[in-house]
């Protein structure tokens, strides 16, 4: 048995989960928020109880030291020698990484170089890796990339209709994201269906504040809705999703904003927040719609219609699907959104059961037994996928 810690480092946060492997038992999990501020928040679960502490955590190195101290103080590990491996979520692996990889100096340099493609995420991921290297230099560490699962996409899916040299010189292409989540739920769907994943065509709908759809054929991603960045695809909480690229200079001209300012609007002030004017949270928007708010209704209609576009095109691409999977915050917990997405899909063999659909955050088949296309709710577990890859690549006994 080995203890493996899964890490997701953000610019001012550090999310962690400690597993006993290979049993995949969660020993503890927690979150460090507001790193760099005087009122940082450290939360850890001990024996099922959440412990919360507000203190000054100036940087990620201090956060890591505090985390490791808490593990020993609370008896979760007797000593740090029990930690056999560390798994780091890294947002962007470019074309360089089609799988998770053991972190070396060369790999770390490559991840830093890829920061051009993910300036909001990769630098924070690197900070997290370095912080652990300082404290646990001899413990194997593995990088698990959000983009890796989608590296199986064919050129017809990942190339943009731009001058080919842009791809050759600058790496401009579709990369896709949420790969670890899409991989987990499609593998789990195959288990639940009792069929080899190689025989299945699956649609994975990762619907949260960020959202993406993936077409997975034979266990391999063949297309996905996010693109060069996580801004592309369906309408999201605060992100616009796909739009006419000529809108960017037009908005700049009309508003006097810079490129950076417009891109910031597209990332942080658009999507459901932009359409409603008051919230990115679908729970708030559904409540407002029930009160008769027109913009809430329109926003929800836009959200669902964009998902329909991908379901239709990916079903055509795979010549039919065996199952549609719902995962992430909205996908796992919103029966209303699932119902609206599935309504009217009988033409493609979807027959969902409204009673079975009344589930929240748990695995369930929500289609009728006779439905040719199965509908499955599967809570995602990116952390356990990270731990599995550490076990696979870290040579951990």
From Swiss-Prot:
Task performed by this protein: Catalyzes the formation of acetyl phosphate from acetate and ATP. Can also catalyze the reverse reaction.
Subunit record text: Homodimer.
An example Gene Ontology CC term for this record: cytoplasm
Catalytic center residues: 146
InterPro entries attached to this UniProt entry: Ac/propionate_kinase, Aliphatic_acid_kin_short-chain, Aliphatic_acid_kinase_CS, ATPase_NBD
Textual note on the cofactor: Mg(2+). Can also accept Mn(2+).
Pfam family, one: Acetate_kinase
Marked site positions, Transition state stabilizer: 178, 239
Name under which the protein is recorded: Acetate kinase
PROSITE patterns from the UniProt entry: ACETATE_KINASE_1, ACETATE_KINASE_2
Compartments where found: Cytoplasm
Gene Ontology biological process: acetate metabolic process; acetyl-CoA biosynthetic process
Family in the record: Belongs to the acetokinase family.
Keyword Magnesium: yes
Cofactor: Mg(2+); Mn(2+)
Record-listed substrate binding positions: 89
Catalytic activity annotation: acetate + ATP = acetyl phosphate + ADP
Species: Bacillus cereus (strain ATCC 14579 / DSM 31 / CCUG 7414 / JCM 2152 / NBRC 15305 / NCIMB 9373 / NCTC 2599 / NRRL B-3711)
Residues noted as binding ATP in the record, renumbered to the chain: 15, 206-210, 281-283, 329-333
Keywords (A to Z) from UniProt: ATP-binding, Cytoplasm, Kinase, Magnesium, Metal-binding, Nucleotide-binding, Transferase
Pathway listed: Metabolic intermediate biosynthesis; acetyl-CoA biosynthesis; acetyl-CoA from acetate: step 1/2
